[in-house]
Design a protein with these regions (language model features):
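Glycine-rich, basic loop-to-helix element that forms the pyrophosphate-binding segment
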Residues: 67-84
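Donor-binding/catalytic cores of nucleotide-activated saccharide
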Residues: 94-211, 216-235
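Conserved donor-binding/catalytic core segment of Leloir-type glycosyltransferases
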Residues: 340-344, 515-535, 541-544
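Glycosyltransferase donor-sugar binding loop
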Residues: 373-379, 527, 555-570, 588
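A short, active-site helix/loop in glycosyltransferases that binds the activated sugar's phosphate group
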Residues: 470-495, 501-505
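Nucleotide-activated donor-binding/catalytic signature segment of Leloir-type glycosyltransferases, i.e.
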Residues: 569-589
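Aromatic "clamp/platform" in nucleotide-sugar-dependent glycosyltransferases that forms part
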Residues: 610
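Conserved acidic donor-binding segment of nucleotide-sugar-dependent glycosyltransferases
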Residues: 645-653, 662-667
Length: 773
């Protein structure tokens, strides 16, 4: 007497001759023998059918259905489901296997719980027979039990990668037949052909349960899994994954009427669609030569709107953003008329970057542009927002939501160009720049420090910026040497612009009075934040110690707020510790007229910064007739042709003290330095910032603002690269709270090797540096 099967195993195959025998053997080893195996040969051209027939001759539980034309595994499964004789169905791919107790355990769970779906674990095995733990963990069931609409919501959560593998579940057969009736009968899906079935089955199922046992053995890189993309035609094949999700959309209308939250179904569909787009673009970095990126992206954009591509990458495959930045089509500044400008930063503060942004807003409004200021975070100080500018604080939670909000702002405010001040301070800016580019809006990015700052900080920001600056229409730096640095890294669309004058500088412009040399006590002043990492206020104390040793009668007033390493009280305590209280006064912040009085009372502005981008404090002091004594930063624009500055090499406090003493004692020399200071400050204020910003937006800056690199530029960059690498290492090694970096020699050699690749003409010099090390 024929015993009806409890479970039908659907085995769609196409040219699986090498593996199908193993698959069938795993079926025949089942501990519960009440099953049937429905093999569907999808027009194989090898010996797949012959292998199946040999097993069929041995065991009547094996059935074979032949399809005359290849219709993909989607049609193979359809044929198998329609022919299945059991109440429940399992799926097995021709290059995989079942665990021996797969039928027994999955069927028992379904019967005991009356579930429509039973999930179970998967063993993922690589070609060497080793377990692929990460993927195996991602395939493990998350939920123990789900009912009603929660079945779908749990299996296809919004914002997560859509998982459509049918072989992870046991299904009620009637559920699958209902699903196939919702889709076109002639549908062919070469890629991800299980997703529409899984998606709709989850939407129709009313009860789901799971077991943790790994009942399926998935062999990674067998068959069609995990292979590289060799050409554009192969990428076009993988692009078919998007068809697999988009074919679902017409079927959703019949499901929304029965759901408590129909919008959730649509959100999950859109999320699954983004997931499949991400699946496709993931090949750009994992399985493809970069030479193919451009052509493959062009093909992708014929199928998928560019904003969806960016959102998919941001949500699921952020590692692809660099490929989108370098291989996508860059929008040039000035390609379209500009009427509406968006200025953006993290949050508006009283700091220098916000000051630049607010000055830009003022100049652009004055020139007739519409200006929108967008803060990415809350708690902005709005006092300085000029009248006529619209301020928006972003509210989205999570990067994908904020990128979507960014797109909405660009559309609603009809933005023509974006100026982003966050390039050096955030690693999320490429997501926003790429979304804007996808909408046809170019982004201009500002780098507010010297290009070698990441070398000093000992981080990978240089590589990150090099990989992503292609997303910008223009990269704006603060000096000609910065332009050379980034152009030598392949970022051709680089310019420099001066920073706009600060309110203090504008107030002082034209009012400077030549100062006389000191006739008694030498008054020195410094102002800024007490940032030991960058501005080195402790070096001021070293200079003060040297001046005391030289028996100079002086007083140094240190003005500014505390920072990470020093509060005002901390620095004052250090002054006491060094016995400098008679000479150094740490007074905290001073603003407005109080700061101006302090500057006017000084004979010299002393600055010991180790790195700066522009340093407007130089011009602010010189505008009041106060000369400058400083550690050298020769690339700074305010330093160029400035005869009101005394500069010594970095870290040489003794030399700086001697220069200060000598300048104070030479009345005629001091007078000439004061006169030169006023002249230099006047030059800084002569830039027509309004015209420069308009030329920037129009892509029409004069060539002088984007000079080509010279060999001398490269030599300077090399010298400063070694200096910052060595100094950054030494400072890092001196701080026990930091993890120990690599040896200094190794670090500098890596910098040298990188520099050789960037500056081939300097190879002999760099080789000498390496030999010396």
């Amino acid at each position: 007497m024929h015993t009806p099967p409890l479970v039908s195993i659907i085995l769609p195959v196409h040219n699986d001759e090498a593996w199908v025998g193993n698959a069938l053997e795993s079926c025949l080893r089942q501990t519960n023998g009440q099953f049937e195996v429905v093999c569907v040969d999808d027009a194989s051209t090898d010996g797949t059918s012959q292998v199946i027939e040999s097993y069929q001759a041995r065991d009547q539980r094996i059935r074979l259905i032949r399809l005359e034309q290849n219709g993909s595994a989607f049609q193979g499964r359809r044929a198998g489901i329609m022919a299945a004789q059991s109440e429940y169905v399992l799926f097995l791919d021709g290059d995989d296997e079942f665990a021996p107790d797969a039928v027994e355990k999955s069927y028992a769970k379904a019967r005991a719980t009356k579930a429509d779906l039973v999930g179970f674990g998967v063993a993922v095995i690589n070609p060497d027979g080793q377990t692929v733990g990460g993927y195996q963990k991602r395939l493990a069931p998350i939920h123990h039990s789900l009912s009603g609409d929660d079945v779908f919501n749990g299996l296809f959560p919004v914002g997560r990668a859509a998982q459509g593998q049918l072989w992870r579940y046991l299904f009620r057969a009637s559920l699958l037949r209902e699903v196939y009736e919702m889709l076109p009968e002639d549908l062919v899906l070469p890629r991800v052909n299980d997703l529409p079935i899984m998606f709709l089955a989850a939407a129709r199922a009313r009860k789901y349960v799971s077991i943790t046992d790994r009942l399926y053995r998935y062999f990674f890189r067998r068959g069609g899994s995990g292979h590289a993309v060799a050409d554009v035609a192969q990428f076009a094949f993988y692009l078919g994954a998007i068809d697999a999700v988009e074919c679902i959309r017409p079927a959703l209308d019949s499901l929304t009427e029965t759901r408590k939250d129909p919008a959730q179904l649509i959100r999950s569909y859109e999320s699954a669609r983004l997931s499949m787009i991400a699946n496709v673009i993931g090949f750009l970095t994992k399985n493809m030569s970069s030479d193919l990126h451009g052509a493959c992206l062009d093909l992708l954009h014929t199928r998928v709107p560019q904003p969806d591509v960016v959102l998919a990458a941001v949500t699921h495959t952020p590692e692809v953003l660099s490929a989108l930045a370098t291989s996508g089509t860059r929008i040039e500044a000035g390609e379209r008329p500009v009427k509406s400008v968006l200025l953006t930063t993290k949050t508006l503060t009283t700091g220098g970057v916000s000051g630049v942004l607010l000055s830009q807003a003022h100049f652009l409004l004055e020139a007739g542009y519409r200006v929108t200021i967008v803060a990415h975070r809350k708690d902005s100080a709005l006092d300085g927002v000029p009248e006529g500018a619209k301020f928006i604080e972003m509210r989205g939670k999570g990067l994908p939501a904020r990128v979507q909000e960014w797109a909405r702002i660009c559309r609603e405010e009809e933005i023509d160009v974006i100026i982003d001040q966050q390039i050096l301070y955030s690693r999320q800016w490429p997501s926003f720049a790429l979304m804007a580019r996808a909408l046809g809006v170019p982004t201009i990015g500002w780098i507010h420090s010297f290009g070698l700052r990441p070398i000093y900080d000992q981080n990978d920001l240089t590589s990150f910026l090099t990989d992503h600056l292609g997303a910008l229409a223009t990269t704006v730096t603060l000096s000609p040497l910065d332009v050379a640095y980034w152009k030598l890294h392949g970022i051709e669309h680089t310019v420099y612009l001066p920073n706009p004058p600060s309110p203090l500088l504008m107030e002082s412009a034209g009012t400077g009075v030549t100062k006389s040399a000191p006739e008694g006590r030498l008054e020195l002043v410094w102002w800024g934040r007490l940032d030991e990492r960058m501005k080195k206020p402790a070096e001021l104390l070293a200079v003060a110690q040297e001046l005391r040793r030289l028996s100079v009668d002086f007083e140094l007033t240190v003005i500014g707020p505390g920072w990470r390493d020093y509060t005002v009280a901390d620095l004052a305590a250090e002054v006491e510790k060094r016995g400098l209280a008679e000479h150094v006064k740490v007074v905290g912040p001073r603003l407005g007229e109080e700061l101006i009085r302090s500057i006017d009372a000084a004979h010299l502005f002393v600055t010991t910064s180790i790195i700066e981008g522009y340093q407007l404090t130089l011009a602010e002091a010189q505008a009041r007739g106060v000369p400058v004594a400083m550690y050298e930063l020769p690339w700074l624009v305010p330093v160029q042709d400035n005869e009101g500055i005394v500069a010594v090499r970095q870290g040489d406090a003794a030399r700086l003290a001697r220069e200060i003493a000598a300048l104070a004692e030479d009345r005629e020399r001091y007078l000439s330095y004061s006169q030169a200071s006023i002249k230099a400050a006047e030059h800084v204020t002569t830039y027509d910032m309004s015209s420069l910003y308009q030329q920037l937006l129009q892509g029409a800056l004069p060539p002088e603002f984007s000079p080509e690199p010279t060999l001398d530029d490269a030599r300077q960059i090399l010298d400063w690269t070694v200096f910052y690498a060595e100094t950054g290492f030494a400072e890092g090694a001196a701080k026990p709270r930091r993890t120990a970096p690599a040896k200094k020699i190794s670090l500098v050699r890596r910098v040298a090797r990188r520099s050789i690749r960037t500056f081939p003409a300097l190879e002999p010099v760099l080789r000498r540096v390496q030999r010396a090390l």
